[in-house]
Structures are given as structure tokens and as C-alpha cells.
């Protein structure tokens, strides 16, 4: 379980980086939404998650429990029941062709990053250099936290298992990683070095993101992420591949699942809002999407 969780947290951090690309103009201040409308015999629910969070901040409220209880199946970003998922995650995080990020860093930047990793994680780039920068960034995000990270994905998967409900995925691991891989390596590396140079500022920024998430204010959350000092550069140019295209690809999956049986959908909060977000796309198709909490 520990290895599985580490792999998932690596990917979770990557997705957190991806969320920084979009400023969501959310009209509704909520994370949980009820979906009703044409072809839906019973309501389904959407929940916006934050991929890296402390256990004390992971709140499974009564409305969430009810939504999960009313659902007959659960959809997360990935199929958590897939036994090959852990191995696939580990492989997807590795640099291609045996490359090492050491080859891509200046001597000074290498020293800064190597020292940071040794101090925070007791291992340096000799061990971590074979990871893609965006994968290493996800591990570095965990060093900013005062806890062992918890996961909404794992929690919802465990709740579903306890209730003998099937867990399915909105997309494949390959599709998710293909979107993340469109972020240039140079930008990814800059984010790593910037965080290593300014760890206190990075920790403060991350804490602010979590605090804003807990207010359920999606617009403010995405604004905070978009202004991140540690995204490595202007990520807005990759908004289409990281969020909008994925939202559009998810829509028919969501529609089909919700028509078959009441479903609880949980995915990164950044996918909920704005004109290309899941909420707007569903409303454009004639569904009623109502904020719950």
C-alpha cells in the first residue's frame, strides 16, 4: 500500500501543477454538486477534490456521505481498481530512454536542487534524477506539508469498496500523462529549482492554496494557483490540453454513466468551473447542476 500511495501522490502532485494553468470563473461557491436532467432517472453528483491534502483537512461531510450513499458507482479520474495502475504510474514518471535530469541542469541549479532533496527527503538527484521533473515536483510538494498526505481519491475508493460499489475511471493513465507531458521540460525544471531556492515562500503559497480550497471558493483557488511563483513559467498556454480537452473528453463518459445509474464523480476542483468546465458543459447539454456544499 505504501508504494501504491507514493505513486498516486506523485501523480496527484502532477495534477496539482496542472491545475495552476486555469483561472476558473466559478459562479457557484461549492465543491459538491447535484446533477439532474434529461435521461437521468436519479441524481448524480460531482465533487471537486484537492489532490494533496493533510488528513485533518480531508473532510467527508454528511452531504458527501449521502451523495456517495445514493450513488450506485463511483468515477474518479483514473480507474483505481485497475491492478496494473501502480506499475503504469511508476513507469510513466520515469524519464525516457534512461535519461537523467542532471544532464539538463546547470551546475549551480543541480547543486541547489540536490541539496534541497537531500535535506528534505534524505536522497538526492542520484536517486531522483531519473524521474520526470513534473514527477519530482509532485514529491517536492509533499515536503511543503506538515503531515503525511491524504488522498480524496483513495478515500472515495475505500468508501466505494466498503459499500461494494464499482470504481471506474474518466480517462486512462496514458491520456492523463500525455496531457502533462505537453508541459516543456524547461518549464518543469524551472519550477523545481525555484522551489528549492525559496522553500519558505513555496510552503506559504501551498498553505494558502489549501486554506482557499477549504472555503470552497473555486474562483479564488484557481486565481491563487494561476499566480503561483513555482509553476515554472506561463502555463496558461497549456490550458487546453491540461483541462479543457480533458473536460470535453470526460463529458460523454459522465453522461453515459449518469444515465445508466446514479453516479458519484470526483476529480480535481479545477475541472469544475469556467465556460469549458464540467459544470458549464453539462448545463449546455440541458442538465441542471445545483451546488450542494
Residue ranges of model-derived segments:
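Short hydrophobic "helix-edge" motifs at membrane interfaces and signal-peptide entry regions
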Residues: 12, 38-40, 257-259
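Short secondary-structure boundary/capping elements
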Residues: 27, 56, 245-249
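Bacterial N-terminal signal peptides that target proteins for export
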Residues: 2-11
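Sec/Tat signal peptide C-region and signal peptidase I cleavage site
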Residues: 21-26
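A cross-kingdom marker for long, charged
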Residues: 236-293
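Hydrophobic membrane-targeting signal helices
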Residues: 15-20
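Structured, acidic catalytic/metal-binding patches in enzyme active sites
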Residues: 31, 36-238
